[in-house]
Amino acid sequence: MAEFRIDPEMELPVLPSRARADVSRKPEWLKINLRTDAEFVELKRLMRGQGLHTVCEEARCPNIFECWNRRTATFMILGDICTRNCGFCAVRSGVPTGLDLAEPERVADACVQLGLRHVVVTSVARDDLSDGGASIFAETIRAIRRKNPFTGVEVLIPDFGGNWDALAVVMDAEPDVLNHNIETVRRLSDRVRSRAKYDRSLELLRRAKEMKPHVSTKSSIMVGLGETMQELYEAMDDLRAAGVDIVTFGQYLRPTARHLAVEKFYTPAEFEHLREEALKRGFAHCESGPLVRSSYHADEQSAQAVARRTGAGRAAQTGD
C-alpha cells in the first residue's frame, strides 16, 4: 500500500490510514530544547532532599522544564516500582517493598518549600495492597490541604483493581480534579495496558462523578499506537457518557526499543482537530498537542475548581 502523508495545510477532518507512516525520525514539531538552568537544578535538589519521586522524571516527560518553572509538579507516591508492566510506560516494574506512611507529609512539605501553585499526585500501580494505595492518596490530599490550602490538588489514580470502596476513600478527601487515564482506544487497550480494562476505567470515572459531582474528572489518550480517527471519536463519546469533564491528547513516544512501537506521528493540525471534536462533544476543557501529557497545564485546567473550593476561605482572610 502506498505511504499516506498528511499535508498540515489540508482541510480537516482527516480520514485515517491503516498504513504505517515513516516513523524512523521524529518530526520537527516534536523536538524540544532541554534546559538545566539554576532554578531547575534547585527544584531537583529540593525533591531529592525530601526523598520524593516525580513522574516528570520517571516517565521522561518532555515538559518537565516548563512545568517546574510554572511551579507545578507531579509527585509519584507509593514508591517507584510498579506491579504492572504496560507496553508504553518507562516506570520500572517489579515487586514493591513496604509502604512509607510518612510520605504524605513529605509531599505536603515539598509543596511549601517549592512554592507550588498546583500539584498532581499519581502513583505506580500497587496491586499488592488491599486498597491499591487509596488511603495514602487520601492522606496526601489532606496533608497538602492543611499546609497549602490554596494549592490546586489533582490526583491521577490507577484503577484499584475495580475496588470502588478504595475509590470512595480518595473521593472523600475531595481532590480538585480526579484523573484516571484510559490511555488508548478500546481495540488497543488490552495490548497497551497491563491488567487494566477499558470498561473498568470508564466505570471508575462514572462512579467518581456520581460520588462527588462537583469534582472535575479527567482522562487522557495517547495517539500514534495504531488507532483510527473514528476510534478516537468513539473513545471521546465513551468518556463523555461517563461524565468526564476534561480530556487530553498527546503523541505517544517510545521510551526504549523494548516498548511498543510508534505507528504514526500526528500533525499539529490533527491535534487541533481532536481538540475541536472534544469541545463539540461537550468537554469543558481539552489540551491537545504533540507534547501534551496528562498533567500538562493542569494548573489552568483546575483553576476554576480551586476558586470554587477556596473562595469562601479567601474572602474570610481578606475581610471581603
Swiss-Prot record:
Q: Give the reactions, separated by semicolons, that this protein catalyses.
A: [[Fe-S] cluster scaffold protein carrying a second [4Fe-4S](2+) cluster] + N(6)-octanoyl-L-lysyl-[protein] + 2 oxidized [2Fe-2S]-[ferredoxin] + 2 S-adenosyl-L-methionine + 4 H(+) = [[Fe-S] cluster scaffold protein] + N(6)-[(R)-dihydrolipoyl]-L-lysyl-[protein] + 4 Fe(3+) + 2 hydrogen sulfide + 2 5'-deoxyadenosine + 2 L-methionine + 2 reduced [2Fe-2S]-[ferredoxin]
Source organism, top-level taxon: Bacteria
Cite the Radical SAM core domain residue spans from the record.
68-284
Q: Name one Pfam family in it.
A: LIAS_N
Q: Where does [4Fe-4S] cluster 2 bind?
A: C82, C86, C89
| Subcellular location as annotated | Cytoplasm
Cofactors that this protein relies on? [4Fe-4S] cluster
Q: Where is the composition biased (Low complexity)?
A: 303-320
Binding-site residues, [4Fe-4S] cluster 1: C56, C61, C67, S295
EC number annotated for this UniProt entry = 2.8.1.8
Q: Name one GO cellular component term.
A: cytoplasm
Pathway in which this enzyme or protein is active: Protein modification; protein lipoylation via endogenous pathway; protein N(6)-(lipoyl)lysine from octanoyl-[acyl-carrier-protein]: step 2/2
Region spans: Disordered:
300-320
Cofactor remark:
Binds 2 [4Fe-4S] clusters per subunit. One cluster is coordinated with 3 cysteines and an exchangeable S-adenosyl-L-methionine.
Gene Ontology MF terms in the entry: 4 iron, 4 sulfur cluster binding; lipoate synthase activity; metal ion binding
**First-level EC class:** transferase
Q: Which keywords does this chain's UniProt record carry? A: 4Fe-4S, Cytoplasm, Iron, Iron-sulfur, Metal-binding, S-adenosyl-L-methionine, Transferase
Q: Which family does it belong to?
A: Belongs to the radical SAM superfamily. Lipoyl synthase family.
Q: Which PANTHER family match?
A: LIPOYL SYNTHASE, LIPOYL SYNTHASE, MITOCHONDRIAL
Q: This protein is called what? A: Lipoyl synthase
List the source organism.
Symbiobacterium thermophilum (strain DSM 24528 / JCM 14929 / IAM 14863 / T)
